Regions:
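N-terminal leader/linker segments that precede catalytic domains of diphosphate-processing enzymes
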Residues: 1-165, 173-189, 193-249, 257-311
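Short aromatic/basic micro-patch
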Residues: 254
Length: 311
């Protein structure tokens, strides 16, 4: 398997240009106050038949109709469009087969819920989505060989995205109406069978990572993502063991950090999980300015400024 570098891992997931890209249409709020997402010209054309989205081909904008001045009205409008588009062959893979019956919240202005949309539909309109990623680990002074170890699951072979790849110990999207902490507790049990009392007493907030991913390459849909990061320290290697509670993972392996580094550089981790692991390794001193000449770019690109309002 081809060996990569830490900066390549970051560039792969934070792949969208840092310059303004005139290729995309801008999804604008009903009062014109903010840009909420970037949409490809191909997808933008499907809005021509939607009376509640005003398309301006010259300005390359898609503006939510001014009369949709409440979150309830906007929710209803996007729900109607998403449901209708499920039947369009062009969206059969991304929308129909990817339908999750889970709502993601878009914010505008910052901190204020503006609209809730189907998770699968969010990918089509390039809005920010949110999640939590949790690094389960045994610190060196508590491990059997004096080396830091991480609990690493392998994604189920039946997963529609990145089947069989390595993942973070726990990860999940921030679906309405759950908050960040509620999602941490919920996902820890659902994905790894970890009880709430254990999580409450062992997990700590470790920051946030932000990036804009192009899952299908350049000039296609974009995925701006914000992931809240938590470190979950285990007391030892045996007392509490994560296991695949909901079948999202095939198994969990307690890997020595040297093996994690090796598999990370062999591109065995799901792309955004590779970034989260890299961030963990930076924070715990396994990637340093002395060990990697691209250290500054690695750290800064794990924390990209977003062009849209945020949570």
């Amino acid at each position: 398997m081809t060996q990569t570098s830490y900066i390549d891992i970051i560039r792969k997931i934070d792949s969208f240009t840092y310059e303004e890209d005139e290729f995309y249409y801008k999804l604008k709020a009903h009062d014109g106050s903010a840009t909420l997402g970037y949409i490809t010209p191909t997808i933008s054309k499907y809005f021509e038949d939607e009376q509640d989205i005003l398309l301006d081909a010259e300005k390359k904008t898609l503006t939510i109709s001014p009369y949709l001045d409440t979150i309830e009205k906007r929710n209803a409008m996007f729900s109607l469009i998403a449901t209708k588009w499920r039947k369009i062959p062009y969206f059969s893979e991304s929308l129909d087969k990817g339908w999750r019956n889970e709502l993601y919240t878009v914010y505008n202005p910052t901190h204020t819920p503006y609209v809730q949309i189907e998770r699968a539909f969010s990918v089509l309109i390039g809005v920010i989505t949110y999640g939590v990623h949790i690094n389960g680990y045994v610190p060196p002074h508590k491990s059997s060989n004096g080396s830091l170890k991480m609990w690493v699951p392998r994604r189920s072979a039946t997963k529609p995205t990145y089947p069989g790849m390595l993942d973070n110990t726990v990860a999940g999207g921030l679906g309405y109406p759950y908050g960040i902490w509620e999602t941490v507790i919920k996902e820890c049990y659902e994905e790894a069978g970890l009880e709430e009392d254990f999580v409450n007493s062992h997990v700590r907030s470790a920051g946030v990572v932000l990036y804009i991913f192009e899952p299908n390459g350049q000039k296609d849909t974009i995925q701006p993502e914000v992931e809240y990061i938590y470190d979950l320290e285990f007391d030892n290697e045996t007392d509490v063991l994560p296991y695949p509670e909901d079948g999202e993972a095939e198994d969990f392996t307690l890997m020595d950090v040297s093996e994690v580094l090796d598999r990370l550089l062999k591109n065995e981790f799901k792309p955004n999980c590779g970034l989260v692991v890299t961030d963990f390794l930076v924070r715990h001193g396994y990637i340093t300015p002395e060990s990697d000449k691209n250290y500054l770019e690695i750290v800064s690109r794990c924390h990209r400024m977003m062009p849209f309002p945020t949570i």
